């Protein structure tokens, strides 16, 4: 009798547990159903993953920081200069479309290519949705690619031992755009002129009193095409803030976008030299990421490379490296978005792009880059001479219509980001692979 009661009791507990689990799953499903989706619609992929490419071994006594007055630890090996790669392959690939590699700019990582600060679809999934195998990277020395901490440890150890001058000289200068620096670079101004964040206030382009800018072609009658309203309420209210608060407005200092700004830790890597480049001394940024991009292009058997801002010149250095290896044919296209386009800096010539489609692009708040214009003109001069077949074009979004009004430097995160992506995709459809002009008889 007692055993029967126990069975009944256990059955009751089991039924109660099942009911609790069902309620939990139902609750979670309900919460998920109400969640705002980042993607426009389900994304069908064949494969996705991540890997690292490139890098070299380094033996160092400073993989860790020795304690004060302690002997240096035994040598250890670390790997530096590698690059993190994340990819998605669509289930329905566009016929004959090469993969695209997207490269972020200064102070950013590949996060800026995944989704927008207000929770919308980013360029990477949108390209996949359009049938393009897409690879996004964290520059060597940045984000998930990691940096060389031994440089800082060695400098610290030297300073502790009394060699302050040489130790201090070894400490790298980490560049990082500040929150208000990003604002004044891309979204508006700090007013009045000459003020600091403690004495002046932030103003959007297009707000009343927006001063005329020297370089931008935008009109002061419209606002940046950017999700400036996507803010963190906790930061707006200055919860846990350190030091004195800026003059405001607080919401302009609380953009969710600011959270993805990171130090340019590639400065911990060594630089290099390039005999064909002007100047011949190359920064760490223009040394490692171009090498890794070249390796990635070779691994993929060819790709289009789309760069932004700081990485613009890196894309050109990558082309040079592939040229030196006899693999220029693997570059299926080079796209430079508000970045450097100098052929001389990267050791290239216009003839190197005879069979490589080349596109430069600018938004609404940047002046026309004479450097990019000159490169496009030099390539097209060869077309006028009947040399080469690949298209070269400088697309200025501010000339294409109202949908591009207010396009900022961070256009991949803007409110019109997918319209801009369509411009790139349509250009690629028309020009990659390059088509020889038919000779009229």
Residue positions per predicted region:
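Gly/Ala-rich beta-loop-alpha elbow adjacent to hydrolase catalytic centers
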Residues: 306-315
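Bacterial N-terminal signal peptides
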Residues: 14-26
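The feature captures the conserved acid-bearing segment of alpha/beta-hydrolase catalytic domains
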Residues: 336-397
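N-terminal cap/lid segment of alpha/beta-hydrolase-fold proteins
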Residues: 34-94
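Conserved alpha/beta-hydrolase fold motif
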Residues: 305-306, 334
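Catalytic active-site module of serine/aspartate enzymes centered on a nucleophile-bearing elbow/loop
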Residues: 407-441
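Conserved acidic catalytic loop of the alpha/beta-hydrolase fold
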Residues: 287-303
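Short, surface-exposed "cap/lid" segments of acyl-processing enzymes
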Residues: 93-95, 100-138, 142-144, 148-153, ...
């Amino acid at each position: 009798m007692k055993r029967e009661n126990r069975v009944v009791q256990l059955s009751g507990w089991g039924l109660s547990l099942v009911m609790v689990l069902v309620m939990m799953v139902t609750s979670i499903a309900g919460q998920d159903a109400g969640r705002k989706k980042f993607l426009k619609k389900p994304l069908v992929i064949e494969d996705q993953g991540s890997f690292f490419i490139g890098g070299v071994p380094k033996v160092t006594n400073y993989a860790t920081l020795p304690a004060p007055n302690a002997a240096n630890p035994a040598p250890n090996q670390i790997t530096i200069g590698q690059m993190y790669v994340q990819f998605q392959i669509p289930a329905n690939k566009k016929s004959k479309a090469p993969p695209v590699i997207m490269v972020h700019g200064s102070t950013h990582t590949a996060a800026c290519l995944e989704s927008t600060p207000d929770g919308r679809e980013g360029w990477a999934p949108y390209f996949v949705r359009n049938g393009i195998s897409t690879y996004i990277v964290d520059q060597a020395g940045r984000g998930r690619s990691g940096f060389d901490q031994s440089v800082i440890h060695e400098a610290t150890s030297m300073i502790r031992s009394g060699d302050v001058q040489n130790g201090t000289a070894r400490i790298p200068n980490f560049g990082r755009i500040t929150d208000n620096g990003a604002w004044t670079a891309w979204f508006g101004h700090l007013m009045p002129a000459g003020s600091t964040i403690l004495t002046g206030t932030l103003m959007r382009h297009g707000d009343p009193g927006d001063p005329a800018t020297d370089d931008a072609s935008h009109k002061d009658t419209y606002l940046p095409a950017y999700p400036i309203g996507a803010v963190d309420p906790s930061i707006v209210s200055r919860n846990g803030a350190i030091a004195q608060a800026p003059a405001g407005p607080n919401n302009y200092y609380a953009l969710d976008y600011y959270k993805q700004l990171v130090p340019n830790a590639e400065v911990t890597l060594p630089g290099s030299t390039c005999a064909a480049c002007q100047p011949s001394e190359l920064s760490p940024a223009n040394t490692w990421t171009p090498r890794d991009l070249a390796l990635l292009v070779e691994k993929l058997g060819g790709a289009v490379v789309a760069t932004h801002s700081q990485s613009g010149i890196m894309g050109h250095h990558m082309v040079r490296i592939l040229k030196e290896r006899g693999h220029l044919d693997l570059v299926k296209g080079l796209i430079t978005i508000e970045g450097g386009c100098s052929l001389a800096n990267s050791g290239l010539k216009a003839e190197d792009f005879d069979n490589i489609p080349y596109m430069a692009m600018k938004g609404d708040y940047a002046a026309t880059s004479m450097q990019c214009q000159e490169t496009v003109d030099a390539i097209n001069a060869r077309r006028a001479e009947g040399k080469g077949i690949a298209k070269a074009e400088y697309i200025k979004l501010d000339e294409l219509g109202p949908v591009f009004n207010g396009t900022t430097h961070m256009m991949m995160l803007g409110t019109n980001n997918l319209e801009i992506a369509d411009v790139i995709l349509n250009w690629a459809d028309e020009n990659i692979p390059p088509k020889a002009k038919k000779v009229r008889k």
